[in-house]
Amino acid sequence: MKVVGQGLNRVDAYGKVTGEAKYSADLEPRDILHGKVIHSTIANGLVKSFDLTEALKVPGVVKILTCFDAPDCQFPTAGHPWSVEAKHQDICDRRVLNQRVRLYGDDIAAVVAENEVAAAQAARLVKVEYEEYEPIVTVKAAMAPGATPLHPDIRKDNVIVHSHMTMGPKDFTFEDGLKQAKEKYKEEDLVEINEVYDTPRISHCHIELPVSWAYVDVNGKVTVVSSTQIPHIVRRCTAQALGIPIGKVRIIKPYIGGGFGNKQDVLYEPLNAFLTMSVGGRPVRLEISREETISGTRTRHAIEGVCRGLVTKDGTVLARQLDAYANNGGYASHGHAICANCGNVFKDLYRDRLGAEIDCWTVYTSSPTAGAMRGYGIPQAAWFAECLTDDMATAIGMDPYEFRMKNCMEDGFVDPANGITFHTYGLKKCMEAGKKYIHWDEKRKEYANQTGPVRRGVGMSIFCYKTGVHPISLETSSVRMVLNQDGSMQVSMGATEIGQGADTVFSQMASE
C-alpha cells in the first residue's frame, strides 16, 4: 500500500492549531435569538401549571414555550441505527419538553429572547406549580415491590430491560455449578467468594459544551447546526420528536470540541428545532451550561456488581456469577444496550470450567440519565471481573499473575453465544511481556510484609474490548465517493471526527 500505513499529518491539524477550524458557535449569524431551558426543581412529579406573567415583562423576551405547547411525540435518544425489529428498537420515552418530571433538572419549558441576559432573567422569573412525588433515587428502591413506575405509559415497572446470558451448559446456574463441584471435589478443596463491587457516575466533561443553533430555510426545511457525534440519527429523531417528515430536517455537524459518548445521544437538537419553528424560523441559539450538562445530558452508568466465584484451592476457576444493576436515571438513552454489553464482556476473558451465569438489570430512577461513555459498559465489566479475580487469587494464596495465566481464555476457544472460534488471542504473550517489563516478581518480593500507613504495591488486570451487537443490529455502514473533474474526490460517510483521526484515516483509504 502506498498511502495506508504512512505517518501523515492529520488533515484537520492545521485548522485546529491555527484556530481557523469552525465549531458550531463560530458559524452563528449576527441576528440570532437566544434560547434558555427551564429545568424542573423537583426530581419526581408532575407540572400542574406555569405563571409566565413576570417573565414575559422582561425586555427582549420573544416567546416562552412550555411542556403544554410542545408536540406530544415520544422519541428515542440513543445513537443507534434504526432496527426493523420492534423488540430491538430504541425506547421512545422522551418528549421535547416534559410535563411528567422524572429527574431534577428535567426540561419543562424554554425561553426565546433577543439576548442571553434577557433569556436567563426571564427563565428565573417563571413560576411553576408541581404535584411532587417521592424521588426514587436508588436501584433497590426502584425495583422494590410496589414501586411507582416512572414511565407507566410504556413500562409496568422501572426495569428498562433484563438481560440474561450463560456460559457452559444451556440454562446453567451458579447453584448448578456448586452442586456439580461438591459432587466432584472435596468440600475442603473448594473456595466460594461473594463480593459486591460498585462503579460511580462520571461526567464526560468535554471542553465544548453542547451547543447548537437552528433556523428554517426558504423552503420550510428546519436546519440544526450542532456539535453532535450522530448527525444522521439526530435528523431521524428530530423529525420524530416534531412529527414532521425526515426530509424536512437537515443536520449540519461542524468541528466538535470533544464528545466521549455524551454527544452520541440526541440532546437538545429537537428542542432547538422546535424553538426556531415557534418563532417563524428565525435563527435560535441554544447552549447548555456546564451545570446543565452534568444534570441534564448524560453520565456514565453507576452499576452495582454482585459477584460470586467458585475456585479450587489449586487455582482452577469452576464457576462465576454476576448480577449487575445499572442506575439509568430518568430516561432510557443507551441504557438497555450498555448494561447488557457489560455482562457480555464479563464472561469473555476467563474459562469457567463448569459455567457462568450473568443477569443484568437496567433500571429507571429519579436521577440524571446515564448514556454512552467511552468503553460502553466495558470499564464496569473489567472492574467487576478483575476485582473478583484478585479476590479469588488472594483467597487461595495464589499469585494473581499465575492465577490469570492458568484461567484466561486460550486460542481455539469457541464462544457458545455466537459459535465464533478464537483463532488469535495473544493474551498470554501480552501478560508475559508485562510481567517482564514491570519486574513483577522482584516488586512482589520487595513490597511484601510492609507496615505503616503508606505502602507500595504492584498489581495487574486484563480486559477485552469487542464490537458488534448482532442480532440486535447488523450495524452496516456505507460510503459514497464522488470523483471530481480535477481528480480530487468527495467522500461522504457516517463516521464522525471527534479527535480520533477518522477524517485522516478515511482520506488515506480513499486515496489508496
Task: Mark where each language-model region is.
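Flexible, low-hydrophobicity surface segments
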Residues: M1-V161, E188
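Short, surface-exposed loop/turn segments at secondary-structure boundaries that line and modulate
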Residues: L65-D106, K140-I154, I233, R250-N272, ...
